[in-house]
Amino acid sequence: EILKELIPNAGAGFYIEPPFHCDYGYNIFAGENVYFNVNCVVLDCAPVNIGSNVFIAPNVQIYTASHPLDAELRKTLENAYPVTIGDDCWIGGNSVICPGVTIGKGCVIGAGSVVTKDIPDNSLAVGNPAKVIRKLNQEPESKK
């Protein structure tokens, strides 16, 4: 009940392990079967669009907020850029998703990665900054 009030734009099977921190909640749009593990942070100053069947590991941080590099502008301005995570993704623990990033469908982001640029569908991306190291086979493992 409280979760639905905090994040009203989430589909069935949306679950968060506490503690969880967000700026607003109403800017988080999630499909069905989305799972946030413990200690996640979502700075949702702009929309955060999460597809269905997405697993987000412990300590993941999703940022839409940014600040100008210029010190004078930084005193008064904050920018926000939307983040999108496609269907069937797994975001590894301690990863950071930066403002304006789109992670395509079927992606795995390795633990501890810092995603600064878009990641294409069906990719395994790891590192700081995250780089695609290979495409993922989308055939279910049970059929191999």
Segment roles from a protein language model:
Residues F20-A30, Y35-T102, N128-A130, R134-K144:
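Flexible, glycine/small-residue-enriched loop-and-beta-strand segment within the central core
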Residues T102, T116-K117:
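Active-site/ligand-binding-proximal alpha/beta "capping" segment
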Residues L6-I7:
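N-terminal helix-cap/turn-to-beta initiation motif at the start of protein domains
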Residues E1-I2:
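An accessory alpha-helical subdomain
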Residues I109, G127:
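Conserved G/P- and acidic residue-centered "switch" motifs that form tight phosphate/ATP-binding loops
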